């Protein structure tokens, strides 16, 4: 058997990872997956392929806004690949204290970094309650700077 390269590991994990949207948002009436759901589905694959994952987070102020950056790194011990995602932090968010605001931004950034690294589709599920609602086609007047016709 040939030794898998780093990219082979990542490609196999991307293909085998199943992280279903098992959470439900009652307010928006849609299913979603959390960062924890992704990590739970990922652990057996990391073990199978002898890889490890690290997640580090940093905060910085950009143009007067607090921004949290989540960096997800996968490694086989020799080579590493990483992806970063950012989320704004609103310390004055209604109904949340500062720790909850940071936690919410952390979860969001982590989820999207994981999703980008492992190519997870984050569109709404096919069983979403809004799947059969008609979608309005954009009109040229709704698209500033558009000069032409739309063919659909």
For the regions a language model picked out, list residue spans one by one.
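Polyanion-binding surfaces on beta-sheet-dominated domains and ring/shell assemblies
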Residues: 1-152
């Amino acid at each position: 058997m040939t030794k898998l390269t780093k990219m082979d590991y990542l490609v196999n994990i991307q293909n085998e990872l199943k992280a279903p949207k098992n959470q439900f948002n009652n307010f928006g009436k849609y299913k979603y997956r959390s960062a924890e759901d992704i990590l739970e589905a990922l652990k057996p694959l990391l073990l199978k392929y002898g890889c490890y994952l690290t997640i580090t987070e940093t905060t910085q102020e950009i143009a007067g806004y607090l921004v949290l950056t989540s960096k997800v790194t996968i490694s086989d011990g020799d080579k590493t690949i990483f992806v970063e995602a950012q989320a704004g932090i609103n310390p004055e968010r209604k109904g949340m204290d500062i720790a909850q605001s940071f936690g919410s931004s952390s979860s969001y950034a982590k989820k999207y970094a994981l999703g980008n690294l492992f190519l997870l589709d984050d569109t709404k599920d096919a069983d979403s309650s809004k799947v059969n609602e008609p979608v309005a086609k954009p009109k040229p007047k709704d698209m500033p700077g558009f000069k032409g016709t739309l063919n659909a």
